[in-house]
Swiss-Prot record:
Taxon lineage: Bacteria, Pseudomonadati, Thermodesulfobacteriota, Desulfobulbia, Desulfobulbales
Protein's name according to its UniProt entry: DNA ligase
Positions of NAD(+) binding: D86, E87, A88, Y89, D90, S129, T130, R183, E214, K326
Active site: K167 (n6-amp-lysine intermediate)
SMART domains membership: BRCT, LIGANc
Cofactors named for this entry: Mg(2+); Mn(2+)
One GO process term, biological-process aspect: DNA replication
Positions annotated to bind Zn(2+): C417, C420, C433, C439
Domain BRCT: 599-679
Species whose genome carries this gene: Desulfotalea psychrophila (strain LSv54 / DSM 12343)
Family to which this protein belongs: Belongs to the NAD-dependent DNA ligase family. LigA subfamily.
Function comment: DNA ligase that catalyzes the formation of phosphodiester linkages between 5'-phosphoryl and 3'-hydroxyl groups in double-stranded DNA using NAD as a coenzyme and as the energy source for the reaction. It is essential for DNA replication and repair of damaged DNA.
Gene this chain is encoded by: ligA
E.C. numbers: 6.5.1.2
PROSITE patterns xrefs: BRCT (PS50172)
Length: 679
């Protein structure tokens, strides 16, 4: 948590001196600091800085003081004098208020821009804030709300197109073609049309009247030409808007086209389905983060179906059909208390470092992953080590750096499995427990994995599976043989016991893909994608007859090491597989390439194809299935291995540009259907 001008422990009078020295404040700007403290915080500058610097934890603030601090910090930020980082504001202070009171009015209203000189008018359209997500699970919850709304309106959720854009960190405004307004409180804003009169241009040669957007400045230009005059880009933007007479550096920035108004409708974007969004989430976020040469503080995702937008509507604070993903880059330096081993479902023993309790990203952190025991050994991570850790929406943060390692004698490298006590063996960087048949951790984790991959069962999470194991259950066939009375005997209530039996029956009766069923057994290097590849060459029940040589020679994309791991894993699950297979699971077979010779004869056999955009003749999912049946491999993102990009309606510029750069064939939906003779 840093004050923009430097040391957070500076006395209040020196704080003002530093700011005024940097940008030569006008009288109005000097008054702003005093006005904010009097009107918003109601306490002295020293207290404000103590909170911002971390000398006073938000945990120990009254709700009234916490609210006052948020209001003061927001007002200073909007005026161009940020008191602390975006991450600290969002992940520490705002998160603490949300933890105490999720329905607090401050969280449900638009964060207003400071009142400025100029005509205040009704905005042509409400400018709301954007709801925020800090991890993938929050994005998933947002998606479930959209899916529910789509079902109620009779819309196929899988056909919806989602859009992602960079979230600009500039000065929000609305351009109606005649005037430019600040966002204000979302309903009324200040007329700042003189910014255009001063030469401000719309980005990319765009026209006026494109609605909401932000005034931003090129990052490289700011660093090279403006950093000596302004603490940060917000400060520059505020000066451009509010000053009666512009300073020469501001005029030059406008003339150079470094400062522009960027309408949201002109932002570079990603477009795709919900499944693509989840599968490529990190790639999409990182790609959009690099798309514009301006400061951004997140990525905005939204649906583009206007009818569904209208149905979902908005709160007083944000549109329900839109959400902003924000990454937290806060780092804390902590002391390691101990390193505790944990055994995974595949027998890998992972080190988890327990650290002194530290609040990071608004959460109290006590554990951080150390990845593998080679890292513990080589980097000296043990009791007393000092590490720097970060947390970006993950449950367990990660180690960024070992500041002070400990000696080898202080390291605790386990020799035995923490779950079953068996000897551990090194395999590369990892320690493994080889007792996969009776290790409690491997048994329970494997059960959880089975139901998670099936995806059609509720009620078999970690606590339920652990209770079943403690009640004597050690394998899945025995679980499927249980009746309601058996569940009650191990501690489940009558209603829950009945539900468990119903869920098990449901898992067998609902149709699922055969490759998903095989993937649920958790064979190393045999995830859902590889299972589907295998089953395009051999039927499910015959997969256990494959040799390493066959896999490498006959199936595209498998190397010797992978083939060896797969064959060894299949041998290990063979008996269990056929016990469950005999229970009559309803499985949809994967089309064989050799079946009727269709795949071998098709013009796309052996090709890697990516489908993008909304398809007209069939759903994208159906077209992908059909392509696989014709011998193609379907990808989700453009890579050097992609042979063909098939485009539907409303295609994102990102995939098109990447395909063109890599020289990949681009076909319209109609051209593709003619190629494979679907029309």
């Amino acid at each position: 948590m840093l004050f923009c001008a430097g040391n957070p422990w500076l006395p209040a009078f020196f704080l003002q001196f530093v700011i005024m020295k940097k940008i030569d404040l006008t009288e109005k700007q000097r008054d702003l600091l005093v006005d904010v403290l009097d009107a918003e915080a109601g306490f002295a500058e020293e207290k404000l800085l103590d909170i911002a610097s971390g000398a006073v934890s938000p945990l120990f603030l009254s709700e009234s003081d916490l609210l006052s601090f948020l209001q003061a910090a927001n007002a200073l930020y909007r005026a161009g004098y940020p008191l602390l980082s975006d991450e600290a504001y969002d992940f520490t202070f705002l998160t603490e208020l949300r933890r105490r009171n999720p329905q607090h009015p401050y969280l449900l209203q638009v964060e207003a821009e400071p009142v400025q000189q100029g005509k205040t008018v009704e905005l042509p359209m409400r400018m709301l804030s954007t709801d925020k997500a800090y991890d993938l699970e929050s994005i998933r919850r947002w998606g479930r709300r959209i899916e529910k709304a789509a079902q109620e309106k009779g819309i196929d959720f899988t056909s919806l197109v989602f859009r992602g854009t960079p979230k600009l960190d500039g000065f929000a405004a609305y351009d109606d073609g005649r005037r430019l307004y600040t966002r204000g409180d979302g309903k009324k804003g200040t007329d700042v049309s003189r910014a255009f009169a001063r030469g401000l241009q719309v980005s990319r040669g765009g026209s006026r009247g494109l609605g909401a957007g932000e005034i931003v400045v090129n990052k490289d230009y700011f660093t090279e030409h403006l950093a000596q005059f302004f603490d940060n880009s917000r400060n520059f933007q505020a000066s451009l808007i509010k000053e009666k007479t512009l300073a020469l550096p501001v005029v030059k920035a406008i003339e150079a086209g470094a400062a522009i108004f960027f309408p949201f409708s002109m932002l570079p974007d990603w477009r795709g389905s919900w499944l693509e969004l989840l599968q490529e989430f990190e790639e999409i976020v990182e790609g959009l983060w690099q798309k514009v040469p301006y400061e951004i503080d997140g990525v905005v995702f939204e649906i583009i179906d206007e009818g569904l937008r209208e149905v979902m509507g908005a709160t007083r604070h944000h549109h329900r059909w839109q959400i902003a993903f924000k990454k937290n880059t806060e780092i804390a330096e902590v002391t390691v208390l101990r390193v505790r081993p944990q055994t995974s479902r595949l027998g890998r023993v992972n080190p988890v470092a327990e650290v002194e309790p530290t609040r990071l990203s608004g959460a109290l952190i006590q554990r951080v992953t150390a990845h593998h025991y080679a890292m513990v050994r080589d980097r000296g991570i043990g009791p007393g080590a000092r590490i720097r850790m970060s947390r970006s929406g993950e449950v367990i943060p990660k180690i960024e750096e070992v500041v002070k390692p400990v000696a080898a004698a202080q390291l605790d490298i386990p020799a035995h499995c923490p779950s079953c006590g068996s000897d551990l063996a090194w395999d590369g960087d990892y320690l493994f427990c080889l007792n996969n048949m009776s290790c409690p951790a491997q048994i329970t984790n494997s059960m959880e994995h089975f139901f998670k991959i099936l995806g059609n069962v509720d009620g078999f999470g970690p606590s339920s599976v652990q209770r079943l194991y403690e009640g004597g259950l050690v394998d899945l066939p025995a679980l499927y043989a249980m009746e309601s009375a058996d569940f009650e005997q191990v501690g489940f209530g009558p209603k829950q016991a009945t539900n468990m039996v119903e869920q098990l029956n449901r898992s067998r009766e609902e149709l699922i893909e055969d490759w998903r069923f095989l993937a649920a057994f958790g064979v190393h290097r045999l995830g859902m994608g590889n299972c589907e590849k295998l089953l395009r060459y051999v039927r499910l029940e015959d997969v256990f007859n494959l040799s390493e040589e066959q896999i490498v020679a006959e199936i595209k994309g498998f190397q010797e090491k992978t083939a060896h791991s797969i064959c060894a894993g299949l041998a290990g699950i063979k008996d269990l597989f056929f016990q469950l297979f005999a229970l009559g699971f309803k499985l949809e077979p994967t089309p064989l390439l050799a079946e009727g010779g269709q795949g071998e004869k098709s013009p796309i056999s052996g090709k890697t194809i990516v489908f993008t955009g909304a398809m007209l003749a069939a759903s994208r999912g159906d077209m992908e299935k059909q392509a696989k049946a014709l011998g193609a491999t379907v990808g989700k993102s453009i890579t050097g291995k992609t042979d063909m990009l098939v485009t539907g309606q409303r295609v994102g510029a990102t995939k098109m540009a990447k395909a063109e750069t890599l020289g990949i064939a681009i076909l319209s939906e109609e051209a593709y259907r003619q190629l494979v003779s679907l029309d």
